[in-house]
C-alpha cells in the first residue's frame, strides 16, 4: 500500500512540475502582486484539482468522455477562458510603463478574485480529467479499498497545495519581484501569449 501511495506521489509531482497554466498563473500573480494573492490563487487551483480528482475517483470521467458534445463544450469553454486571460495580460503589458520611469505601484486584487481565477484556470483545462482518470485507472484497481482511494485523493490534494505554495513563496521573494519590476511588460506579455496559446491549443485539439 505504501508503494502505491509513493508511486502516485511521484507521478503527480512530475505532472505538477511540468509548466502549464496553473504554474504560470501562480508565478505571475506572486511577482506582480503579492504572496497573499498568489496563495489565494493556489487555494483556488487546489479546489479545482479536488473537483477533477473527485470526478475521476467516482468514475464520472467515463461519462464525460462518452458524451462527445459535453466534452467539446468543456474544451471550448476552457479554451476561451484561457484566451480571455491571455488577452487581459497582453493588454495590461501594453499599458505598462518602464519600471525605471516611476516607482512601481502594486494594485492588489479584490478579496477572493485571485481564488476564483485560480479555480477557473484549473477547471478550464479539461485535460486534467484525462490525467486523473489515467492515474486512477492505472494505479487504483478494484482491489483497492475506499479508504485507500480517498487517501490517494487527500495525497493528491496536499501535494498540489504544497507544490504551488513553494512556487508562490519563491516568486514572491524580493529579488524576484525586483526583477519583475524591471521587465514587467515583457513578462506579462510572455505570460499572456502563453495563456492564449494554451487556450487556442485546447480549442483546436478538441
UniProtKB/Swiss-Prot annotation:
It is a multi-pass membrane protein. GO terms for cellular component: plasma membrane. Coiled coil: none annotated. Keywords: Cell inner membrane, Cell membrane, Membrane, Transmembrane, Transmembrane helix, Transport. Its main location: membrane. Residues 65-66, 174-206 are cytoplasmic. It is found in: Cell inner membrane. Conducts the efflux of threonine. It comes from Salmonella typhi. The gene is rhtC. InterPro entries: Homoserine/Threonine_efflux, LeuE-type. NCBIfam families: 2A76, PRK10229.1. This is Threonine efflux protein. Residues 22-43, 88-149 are periplasmic. It holds the Pfam family LysE. Belongs to the Rht family. The chain crosses the membrane at residues 1-21, 44-64, 67-87, 150-173. GO terms for molecular function: amino acid transmembrane transporter activity.
